[in-house]
């Protein structure tokens, strides 16, 4: 099977895209939340869905620990937030990870407690015991999803219809968890199924199709395959000269947005908004830098306001990645001009914009620090500016 370039996949996962300066689409995204001191207590309980079959539960958080139980794919397990101090390198579904272990208990067998590798656990809830979702209903959904073959396009529609039938009255944390399970299933179809092959081989694309997709003007009913993709929860994206399917978050929002908790609603609406425009193409930034700054600040404030959000790892990555791009650029959108080695005007403008509009944010503080170095260097690329950017990349990667 042909695969999408890894850099493009990473960019799409972290940041779907928002609207650029030239567009005025009303996406319905919420304004950046006000940065307030965290007022939520540390979660009493975490719930996770097991994403790998026969996942070992060990008595110690390492590969040498004795296996006390094997968790089934789709099983819901509970934990109190205890994380191992050590990390281990493990390859799951051909993807290498270096992650810690979580201490969890099987909800099927209360006597089965131990350490499970965290990369094989998908968090679906973090909060108090009193507001946790119905584990039986989540287990039923998770179990049903395991029966659907991810390599068959029709599985998307089956999953969506099951959720609509079974969770029509769900609200709050139950709706949050159901959304996560459904989105993760569709994402597995996107990345591990054969959908890329379908769009490469089954459609004779017309020349203007790519531009229509970029402008949100493509009619998904145009071809039998694209009509089927839409019915099964997918939309089209363009990148690196290819047309490929991704999960359509607008479809998820249509069902879940008025059911989920307020933080999840903000998260969902922002992700729908960002998916309107892919921020990258061919290694370059293709949205306005001021739009990218707005997104970075949204996620910074969101993370401050929701310190225990169930998808905190993802939202922190979004914040850090966007901040990194704004200060170090990308392969084909460089901070320093390739020929004269001076700061590109677009970056100088957005840094000034950030300093004026987003006073007090971490982004503004980082920009102020770097622009001070740039000013001393005459806005030229020097060993000092390069050293700062290298250290900044390392700091962001280690957070």
Name what the model sees in each region.
Residues 24-45, 66, 91-136:
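Boundary regions of SH3-family modules and the immediately adjacent low-complexity/disordered segments
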């Amino acid at each position: 099977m042909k695969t999408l370039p890894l850099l493009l996949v990473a960019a799409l996962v972290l940041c779907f895209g928002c609207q650029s300066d030239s567009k005025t689409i009303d996406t319905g995204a919420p304004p950046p939340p006000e940065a307030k001191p965290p007022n939520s207590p540390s979660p009493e309980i975490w719930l996770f869905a097991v994403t790998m079959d026969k996942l070992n539960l060990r008595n110690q958080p390492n590969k040498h620990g004795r296996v006390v139980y094997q968790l089934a794919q789709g099983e819901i397990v509970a934990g109190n937030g205890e994380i191992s101090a050590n990390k281990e390198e493990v390859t799951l579904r051909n993807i290498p990870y270096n992650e810690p272990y979580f201490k969890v208990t099987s909800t099927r067998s209360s006597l089965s407690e131990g350490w499970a590798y965290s990369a094989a656990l998908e968090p679906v809830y973090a909060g108090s015991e009193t507001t946790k979702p119905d584990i039986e209903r989540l287990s039923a959904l998770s179990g049903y999803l395991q029966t659907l073959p991810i390599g068959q396009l029709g599985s998307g529609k089956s999953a969506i219809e099951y959720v609509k039938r079974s969770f029509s009255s769900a609200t709050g944390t139950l709706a949050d968890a159901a959304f996560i399970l459904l989105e993760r299933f569709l994402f597995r179809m996107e990345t591990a199924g054969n959908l890329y092959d379908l769009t490469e081989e089954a459609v004779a694309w017309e020349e203007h199709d790519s531009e229509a997709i970029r402008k949100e003007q493509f009619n998904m009913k145009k071809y039998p395959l694209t009509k089927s993709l839409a019915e099964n929860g997918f939309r089209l994206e363009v990148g690196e000269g290819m047309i490929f399917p991704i999960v359509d978050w607008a479809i998820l929002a249509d069902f879940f947005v008025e059911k989920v908790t307020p933080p999840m609603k903000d998260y969902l609406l922002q992700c729908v908004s960002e998916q309107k425009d892919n921020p990258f193409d061919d290694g370059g930034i293709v949205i306005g830098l001021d739009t990218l700054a707005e997104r970075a600040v949204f996620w910074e404030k969101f993370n401050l306001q929701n310190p225990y959000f169930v998808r905190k790892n993802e939202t922190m990555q979004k914040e850090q990645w966007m901040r990194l791009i704004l200060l170090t650029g990308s392969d084909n959108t460089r901070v320093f001009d390739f020929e004269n080695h001076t700061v590109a005007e677009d970056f100088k403008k957005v840094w000034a914009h950030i300093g004026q509009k987003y006073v007090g944010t971490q982004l503004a503080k980082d920009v102020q620090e770097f622009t001070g170095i740039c000013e001393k260097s005459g806005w030229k690329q020097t060993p000092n500016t390069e050293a700062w950017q290298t250290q900044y990349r390392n700091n962001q990667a280690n957070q």
